[in-house]
Regions:
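Sequence-level preference for short, compositionally simple segments enriched
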Residues: 2-351
Length: 351
């Protein structure tokens, strides 16, 4: 068994374990279908250093059924994986927009998202739409600050995902563990998921923080996106950001950073371990905002959102002295601890 096959299998099972920790797969069977298609036996066997022969169909050698083969039969039945792909896609560039296409099967410009990002012109004033076909893309993606005005256009957050498994330990710090890291301004993502499938840490484990997305560029927007992880899932680092109709999953401080961000209509799901009825255990928190000074103009606002899942969690922990988080018109299940907030063991951070 080769290293490549072992890696493929380990990522496959890590992804299944991460998603099985909630009822996500039962609610989104389409995503499970794409996951199984991506890791079909042919894909896994292709990791082996030899060619797997095509099996001979049973009964071919001694069949008494007489079938006259015509050359045209093969033309009618032969079909490639790219046959259903639009022949004229992506369209040509315009004065304001370029469209790149990513498909893991090689049906268009690029097979990886990072390759498409690398092809974007430095400091291009045009918007570059990177259209990402249905699939699971196992790669770490970085958009440097010299690549502004990029859009990631997926085909649905349950069918298109960028996945990696770094942790604070493996990447020299939490801030660098993100599966996708965006430092450029004017970034947009639509209908795509960002996942970190590192193992869910046990109590007291050090260095297991695992970011799915770090957004550190100004004026970013996310529509219909998914963010999957456990501790520190979404690093809403700095800048002004808008999240609309997104799905955000985690356990501890899973929306954290010092950005000025507005979350509208988002579904927030805790995957903290279940807590027995009546127990006073707290084992998670939704937010950890990092406003360090009253002069900083930052904070998280959640409007018309919903919070559910498992565990007994706080709405937030005051990561820095002036942490600012507001929940408005947001429904919450009884997983939220009655006290609501935690001052990080520093009473001066209480209002």
């Amino acid at each position: 068994m080769t290293t490549k096959l072992i890696s493929s299998l380990s990522i496959f099972f890590a992804l299944l374990a991460a998603l099985a920790s909630t009822n996500f797969l039962s609610q989104h069977t389409l995503f499970l279908k794409h996951l199984l298609i991506h890791f079909n036996p042919q894909t896994l066997l292709s990791s082996l250093p030899f060619i797997v022969p095509t099996p001979i169909p049973f009964g071919c050698r001694h069949s008494h059924h007489h079938h006259h083969h015509h050359p045209s039969d093969e033309r009618k039945t032969t079909k490639t994986i790219c046959d259903d792909f639009p022949p004229d896609f992506p369209p040509p560039d315009t004065n304001t927009t370029s469209i790149f296409c990513v498909d893991s099967n090689g049906c268009c410009n690029f097979t990886t998202v990072q390759a498409a990002v690398d092809a974007v012109g430095v400091m291009s004033p045009k918007r570059t739409v990177i259209w990402i076909n249905t699939g699971i893309y196992f790669e770490k993606v970085i958009i440097p600050k010299t690549k502004p005005n990029i859009t990631f256009q997926g085909q649905g957050y349950t069918s298109t995902a960028i996945v990696w498994n770094d942790t604070a330990n493996s990447s020299h710090g939490t801030f660098y563990s993100g599966s996708v890291q965006v430092f450029a301004p004017n970034f947009i993502a639509k209908n795509i998921s960002f996942m970190n499938v590192a193992p869910i840490p046990g109590p007291g484990v050090v260095g297991a923080q695992a970011v799915a997305l770090r957004i550190a560029g100004d004026q970013a927007a996310f529509w219909g996106c998914g963010f999957f992880g456990a501790q520190d899932t979404l690093h809403d680092d700095r800048g002004r950001h808008y999240f609309k109709d997104c799905y955000i999953q985690g356990s501890i401080d899973f929306i954290f950073g010092n950005a000025k961000s507005f979350y509208e209509g988002c579904h927030i799901t805790s995957i903290a371990s279940p807590v027995a009825p009546g127990a006073r255990v707290i084992n998670g928190a939704v937010t950890a905002h990092g406003r360090a000074s009253k002069d900083e103009n930052s904070g998280f606002a959640f409007v018309n959102c919903s919070i559910g899942g498992t565990g007994r969690i706080w709405l937030g922990r005051a990561w820095r002295p002036f942490s600012t988080v507001v929940f408005s018109y947001t429904s919450m299940t009884d997983i939220i601890a009655p006290e609501g907030w935690n001052d990080f063991n520093d009473p001066t951070r209480d209002l």
